[in-house]
């Protein structure tokens, strides 16, 4: 009898362990059910939980700008660099919207958009050409009195690592003497190492994601990779898509 009971108990424990493991994988690979779940995966504050259809985007990015300022002690330091790290599928323009928010406050801002291509071959606003050794410095496109924009030219890069290049790093550092804010709009963290390379150069890093465009496992990987690379994530902007 004791042996049978032991076998039954062992089988039951095995089933419980399997269910627990299955539940763990289920939770790990599912999409986060709430902003709180995103917060738990990344272990950083939720800057805003955006109900997309009703959202006033201008207010959202004002809130983000204020959050990032508070994180540096509330003072307007000259030349603060901020890296936008989108994870999963959804937001490609969060960096632009943040840069516009800084510019609206009359802060001289440079956006380096690593997602957007430059306007044609003759455009002088490509950071790629400069990093690849072009003697002439990039000429940012002027969006308004307070906002300048640089893009990248992926085709011209030919898989050369532009963001990890020393010329890119020194350019960002140099621009901190000219601009009050430098915003780097990085590509999707899940698909490119550029966001981490840019993150190492910046004073502040924040994450943006849509709940419908990311799973928990990707969020855990982002948290761990940032920790390994010594990148502090200030907070996350969550869209309820």
Q: Residue locations for each model-derived region?
A:
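Short boundary/hinge segments that flank catalytic cores
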Residues: 5-110, 114-148, 156-162, 166, ...
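Switch II (G3) loop of P-loop NTPases
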Residues: 149-194, 199
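Conserved Switch II/interswitch segment of TRAFAC-class P-loop GTPases
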Residues: 185, 189-191, 202-220
